[in-house]
Amino acid sequence: MELDDQSPETIQYKAISGKFGDVRYFITTLDQSDAVENIRFADEIQGSWSFSERVQRKLDENRANTEIFSYLAQGGIRFFNSIVVVLLPNSNEQTEFWDFDEVKSGGKIIEKWVTLNLYKNVARIVIDGQHRLLSLRRYWNAHTGKEPLTPQQLKENYKCSETFDIPVVYLVFRDLGRVGLANSSQAVRDEIIQATRN
């Protein structure tokens, strides 16, 4: 189900949190439907930043739909590394779209474990793992019957009956978008563009 259609104003993920300079990251897992329906490519997001400013490299759709898709659909032992996703405002007016709560056990904070809260309409843009995400979408479309396997793929024993937990690393920059601490300055946004290019 898409995040925009869910009842609560937020969706929560259990995550491990860390910092790398001005970047805070949250390591978590998403079920496959959440990943393919809610993580977007930069060119799918409406906004003031151009595609060339936001994306790392041009997608090779053929590679994603053949080589990587066959890796997923032909079974056996397989694993994907994390997809790296930056959390950004979905519009110039949106200033708050994420927060986190520390996890406690017996009244004590469990170091680095948090509950990540993502608010509706946050832009979740893949910055590393674009080809993996594209192949996961193709797999999901075959799994749900939206885009059936071809006769040749069936002959080659492709199967899309299994679902996966997708490892994801969410990135946020400083307090941009954090509830109660949102900084919507253009300077921070410009730094984000530069950081996601590297």
What function would you assign to each model-found segment?
Residues M1-A123:
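N-terminal extension/subdomain marker
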Residues F79, P89, W98-N198:
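Basic- and aromatic-enriched surface patches that contact anionic nucleotides/nucleic acids
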